[in-house]
Amino acid sequence: DPALARRLTNVQAQANVPITGLTPLTAIDLVGRLRGGRPRQTRRRAEELIEALDLGEWATTPAQKISGGVARLTAFAMCAVVPGRLVILDEPTNDVDPVRRRLLWDQIRLLADAGSAVLLVTHNVREAERAVDRLTILDHGHVIAEGTPAALVAGHGSSFVLEISRTPGRRIEPPAGMSLTQHDAARASVAVDSHRTTQAVEWAAHALRDGAIERYELAPISLEDVYVDLTGSTGEEVRRHAA
């Protein structure tokens, strides 16, 4: 039933919503009223979203003069002002600066906590890991993994990853039994089991003193690492999709 779907569902498309002739505040308020919100409550909610997403500077700026990031945040707020039982967000963080991306993820989490089912599509795996309850990883349209972030990370073969910035022109060999993955000319990583972290750090510290690498960082395996291993995408490709 298309009419029922429209009542129960809010959608933020990947392409920005054309709101030429309106301001962000007016557009958010107008959509809230079209969704059945009471005028006074809708206006208050629109103003709350403007403040929560740090859009006050552009609240009354004509849409044709705002940036792509502000337009993206406005489109999200138009979905969130009077949310339905299902909220669908397609790449909601595209074009959004790092500071406001954090604010946006907070608002997405609040939508879910308030009772809406939130279905979101994103390549920003590292940020999504902190906000989602469950996820499905797709590769060329096929489901290759699904579950909670913790379960997917726990199912990974290694517990830690050693990120390395290589010195140009220098060759490095990881400790025996550890495999090095080259991401680009300067960056590589080594998967490390929990019982070999000391050995991995000692090896990296020696390589740093020897000038073979410029820096290193040992961190727990992230959902992004799982995504890269499952899909075969490089970390740089993941970051490029998320930019």
Language model features with spans:
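Conserved ABC ATPase "signature" region
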Residues: 29, 33, 41-58
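Conserved ABC ATPase signature
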Residues: 62-66
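Hydrophobic anchor residue at the start of the ABC signature
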Residues: 76
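Catalytic Walker B motif of ABC-type/P-loop ATPase nucleotide-binding domains
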Residues: 87-91
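Helix N-cap at the start of a conserved alpha-helix in ABC-type nucleotide-binding domains
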Residues: 98-100
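ABC transporter nucleotide-binding domain
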Residues: 107-193
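C-terminal coupling/interaction segments
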Residues: 195-243
